[in-house]
Amino acid sequence: MMSLHTAMLVGLLAPLVVAILTPFLAVRHVWRDAAGPIGGVITFIAAVHVALAVLDGETPRLFVAQIAEGLALEFAVTPLGAIFGLVASGLWILAALYSVGYMRGNHEKHQTRFAAFYAVAVHAAMAVAWSGNLLVLFVFYEILTFSTYPLVTHKESALARNAGRLYMSILVGTSVVLLLPAVVWVWLSTGTLDFRPGGYLAGQIDPAMAPILLALFAFGVGKAALMPIHRWLPAAMVAPTPVSALLHAVAVVKAGVFTILTVVVYVFGIDFLAETGAADWLVWLSAFTILASSMVAITKDDVKARLAYSTISQLSYIVLGAAIASSIAVQGATLHIVMHAAGKITLFFCAGAIYVQAHLTKISELDGQGREMPWVFAAFFIGALSIIGIPPLGGSWSKFMLMVGAVDSGYLVILGVLGLSSLLNIYYLLEPVSRGFFRPKVKTVEVTSHPLVVIPPVLTAILSLLLFFYVDFFAALAKLMVIS
């Protein structure tokens, strides 16, 4: 049995080792393609070991260097970090397998470069998850941005380069102009950047200034895709579908909402936010983003574009839970990181599988195609039901807890927002399924079988189902997060 110190080293370094070895393993494509899934399994085992220790009340730590008095380069795993680490490492296994099938099926160029940067992105996500303070989080948040740029621009077309410029300008711009000053503000006000249970800003900053500091964090974390800092996400859909899965489920956007939740719980403290009302404005902005992005999603005929706006909406569920700042709402937001990851990666896997097997990208082209690709469309159906929040799928737990949190905190209007959002979700997520299974075929295409792009979405769809029945482990970590 490995020690916690060893487990943390393995969890942080295994993806980096995969990235370094990938160019050398490319002499045999099968070696290169096996490195990602194997690295994912190793990283996930380490993440499970660390998460179990956190559940037992420990705080696994890995000290690297002392930078200044009260400021260290250190990793320390919180219950929230343990959850994000499990999501990032666990889904990397299936995403790596899927990437092999997708890249081979489409005969994509630069597959070695793609696999290497994919692993670097997972390394950065794990470091963000296990960061011990705001400095470490900020550094690896930036590394995650830069490591995903080559993935977004992978096709090297003019459209991809334009998307890459927008991606970098928004994510780097917001982090440097807004997030970094917020981190400096916390340091100057408190003399520390550590994460502490219950937060520590109460009594350290003027309550009247708390909404401004929170705004710097909320908009500085561009990866959370709050409106109007959201345009990078739909633009990034020009990337190959495995990148979309990485952006939407495994690493990038989850790093964004993870950062906001971390700041709310471990820096501000939910009691401080609730007592001062400093996050009230964020509740309403999140509600607006939830509905506005859902309405935009309805207008999109491109499958990935529709899913992109769905992601913007679902991310704001998590921000909403953080902003409500009650125990049950924060737990619901935390669980939604897990549930949305499983459901949304299923949907993107299915979108990519349809493209690889039939070269279809438009919802209007899917009429009758469900009978040609039943496993893919069935997986899409299950993933959609989880995102909508219908039992017995995992997404129903997190949405239920968010609704309870809204009512308990007196936000009755938010209950209506969540209900309306679910109705909109039903419309725009189930349309591809209804077209695929229940409409006559309008376009005859040759469907080629590619098991490596079909098996992963089926497995993640099953995961979305299992998460409904086996939610206790994640729920216990989420509860520990707000009572520790």
Each predicted region: which residue ranges?
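Transmembrane helix-loop-helix hairpins at membrane boundaries of multipass inner-membrane proteins
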Residues: 1-9, 20-116, 191-200, 262, ...
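Membrane-interface helix-loop-helix modules in multi-pass inner-membrane proteins
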Residues: 55-58, 62-85, 134-137, 141-152, ...
